[in-house]
């Protein structure tokens, strides 16, 4: 079983904000594959389905971003999911808007959701799908990440989200991670 985790903050005030990029991508993936995130427990909403013959668990923590690990680790334990079968979808300010980047391990890079997952899971060796939101030009970081995409930014983000969903499809299908990085980064 593969586990795809989207990072974001809960509550309608955070819907469609840059920091909820992970939620938006996993929602698109789940919708494309008819996976309903109807189970609510272990500080998360999740659902599962078959994608290309592989069972996939799609997870959205219901904690705030900086406590995401509190949801991820218990779900991994409950479903006996190996860290090698986990992909976390996150926003990344260090990537230009519209770029995606896959990594098979690494530090949190200042992302508090990733930092929490590393702390709870006990390793940095899990997959990341980073979706670029760019650096703020005129806003503080907090105001920027909690703000919504502008009218000009939204189509660029939508294209990146489509590529991210395609990358998730290829990952679930068992594509070699190095090949995925070469194809999508």
Swiss-Prot record:
Reaction(s) catalysed by this chain's protein: an N-acyl-L-alpha-aminoacyl-tRNA + H2O = an N-acyl-L-amino acid + a tRNA + H(+)
Matching Pfam families: Pept_tRNA_hydro
Record-annotated site: Discriminates between blocked and unblocked aminoacyl-tRNA: 9
InterPro entries listed in its UniProt record: Pept_tRNA_hydro, Pept_tRNA_hydro_CS, Pept_tRNA_hydro_sf
Residues of the active site: 19
Record keywords, A-Z: Cytoplasm, Hydrolase, RNA-binding, tRNA-binding
GO terms under biological process: protein quality control for misfolded or incompletely synthesized proteins; rescue of stalled ribosome
Subcellular location: Cytoplasm
Record EC number: 3.1.1.29
GO molecular-function terms, A-Z: peptidyl-tRNA hydrolase activity; tRNA binding
Gene3D superfamilies linked: Peptidyl-tRNA hydrolase (3.40.50.1470)
Cytoplasm found in the keyword field: yes
Quaternary structure annotation from Swiss-Prot or TrEMBL: Monomer.
Annotated protein name in UniProt: Peptidyl-tRNA hydrolase
Gene: pth
């Amino acid at each position: 079983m593969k586990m795809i985790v989207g990072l974001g903050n809960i509550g309608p005030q955070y819907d469609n904000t840059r920091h909820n990029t992970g939620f938006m991508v996993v929602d698109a993936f789940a919708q494309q594959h008819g996976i309903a995130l109807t189970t609510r427990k272990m500080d998360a909403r999740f659902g599962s389905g078959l994608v290309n013959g592989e069972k996939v668990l799609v997870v959205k923590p219901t904690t705030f971003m900086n406590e995401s690990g509190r949801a991820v680790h218990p779900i991994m334990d409950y479903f006996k999911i190996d860290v090698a079968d986990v992909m976390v979808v996150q926003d990344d300010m260090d990537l230009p808007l519209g770029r995606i980047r896959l990594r098979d391990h690494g530090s949190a890079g200042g992302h508090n959701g990733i930092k929490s997952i590393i702390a709870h899971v006990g390793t940095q060796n899990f997959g990341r799908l980073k979706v670029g939101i760019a650096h703020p030009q005129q806003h503080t970081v907090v105001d920027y990440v909690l703000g919504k995409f502008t009218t000009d930014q939204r189509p660029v983000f939508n294209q990146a989200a489509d590529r991210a969903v395609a990358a998730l499809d290829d990952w679930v299908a068992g594509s070699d991670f190095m090949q995925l990085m070469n194809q999508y980064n």
